[in-house]
Amino acid sequence: MIEQGNQVLKTLGYTENSKKHAIKVAEHAAEILKITGADAHQIELAQIAGYMHDIGNCINRQDHAHSGAILTYSILKELDMPISDRLTIVTAIGHHDEKTGTALDPVSAALILADKTDVRRNRVQNPVIANFDIHDRVNYAALSSSLEFKTEKKIIQMNLELDDSMCTVMDYFGIFLERMMMCRRAAEVLGWRFKLVANGSKLC
């Protein structure tokens, strides 16, 4: 389902949402919860949600968070996962898209932070730079991105280095403002604060 969904996105010209993205999000969601003090069970649920969060793309990019949540529920039910755990996972998946979702609990918060901060050049699937849309340009311009945890101040900071010949810092902030506000809310749910630093400039 993950690879079929990514093939759909590639055909439509969207950025990569393959197993590589799924694994990265699962790992980072687990790391976020571990550092912010969640228990082992919540960390495991976040890993599952992170890995499965984009399977709805195999149906349609539009509303993929909700269709993905429904698919995930069916899969986890077949595996006899307790209903409370199923609901935690599908709620996180159903709320990971910035158009319709928000962080509601630690698992959904970790998923949002891990997903929305996965910005990197090799997520661009369009081979022709001249045909890049604005999202392609932003991802292609990302020379490096990382999350830094300032535990004493309880700050989760995204550090981003951009090639400003492709995309300026303000271009990035303008395009991804909705996502960054979503990350801020997610950090607040965890009892932390979210900061974005791009090319050495604090943006939020």
Question: Model segments located where?
Answer:
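Short alpha-helical hairpin
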Residues: M1-Q7
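N-terminal low-complexity or amphipathic/hydrophobic leaders
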Residues: V8, K24, H28-I32
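Divalent metal-dependent catalytic cores for phosphoryl transfer on phosphate-bearing substrates
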Residues: K10-T11, H21, I35-F149
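Class I (Rossmann-like) S-adenosyl-L-methionine-dependent methyltransferase catalytic domain
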Residues: Y14-N17
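Electropositive phosphate-/nucleotide-binding environments in soluble metabolic enzymes
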Residues: K19, I23, L177
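Aromatic/hydrophobic pocket-lining residues that form π-stacking "cages" and hydrophobic walls in ligand
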Residues: A29, A110, C183
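Terminal helices and disordered tails flanking the catalytic cores of nucleotide-processing hydrolases
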Residues: D118-C204
